[in-house]
Design a protein with these regions (language model features):
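Short amphipathic alpha-helical segments with heptad-repeat character
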Residues: 34-41, 74, 78, 139-146, ...
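Short, helix-capping/interhelical loops that line the mouth of catalytic, cofactor-
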Residues: 20-35, 86-145, 169-175, 205-210
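N-terminal secretory signal peptides that target proteins for export/translocation
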Residues: 1-2
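Bacterial N-terminal signal peptides
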Residues: 5-16
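An N-terminal domain-start capping segment
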Residues: 17-26, 71-75
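N-terminal secretory signal peptides
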Residues: 31-79
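Generic structural signal for well-ordered, non-membrane alpha-helices
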Residues: 42-52, 82-83, 119-123, 150, ...
Length: 210
């Protein structure tokens, strides 16, 4: 009899607490995963299309001394992809934050709104600055990028980790803190932003015909 009462109490406690909703689950939802994969594919297709056929002269050309060349933008994207993925992994090493929903619940929409918007310009942090290294060719940058992106996409497609519960800070205090999912999402949104920059370079007066 005592055992039966104990079982009933356990069941009642479970019913009182209720099932874990999708909003409470720190893992990626199916919609979040599909959105991330779509952004990753879109950003890669855009970049490869923009770089297709770019000559060495076009790769190195600058509209002004203080403006980035296409090559510099592409190297910045390569550096940033590695950094942002590493930040996601760094976040996963931190203890799960019980207040992750409060601290990061609105940040995904903020990233989607702010990052592709080129009307607000920001200076790249020093660790992500591509200046001073013009040795990588277009082919080398693309090969390295494809390797990194394959890793990022495989992770996005297969991980079951509770990404949203693990937080850390990055190089832009405006967004801090972000959770691990948001750092991975940052990768393609940041690329979409700079794909626009590459298109702007190609549309600038004086851009070499070949």
């Amino acid at each position: 009899m005592i055992r039966c009462v104990g079982v009933v109490l356990v069941v009642l406690a479970a019913l009182a607490s209720g099932p874990v909703s999708a909003a409470d689950d720190p893992g990626m939802t199916q919609d979040e995963r599909q959105k991330l994969l779509a952004y990753l594919d879109r950003s890669q297709q855009e970049l490869e299309g923009l770089l297709d056929g770019v000559t060495e002269k076009q790769w190195q050309w600058k509209a002004a001394p203080d403006r980035w060349s296409i090559g510099e933008v592409a190297r910045h994207l390569l550096i940033s992809e590695g950094y942002l993925f590493d930040q996601a992994m760094l976040a996963m090493k931190n203890p799960a934050d019980p207040e992750w929903q409060t601290k990061t619940g609105t940040k995904t929409a903020l990233l989607e709104r702010a990052l592709p918007d080129r009307t607000r310009r920001v200076q790249a942090p020093e660790p992500l600055n591509p200046l001073g290294d013009a040795s990588m060719t277009r082919a080398q940058v693309l090969a390295s990028f494809r390797q990194q992106r394959a890793r990022t996409r495989q992770f996005a497609e297969t991980t079951q980790l509770p990404l949203r519960a693990h937080l850390t800070k990055g190089l832009f205090p405006f967004f801090d803190p972000l959770n691990a999912y948001q750092f991975v999402l940052y990768i393609p949104l940041h690329m979409i932003r700079h794909n626009q920059q590459i298109a702007e370079v190609k549309a600038t007066a004086g851009y070499p015909a070949r």
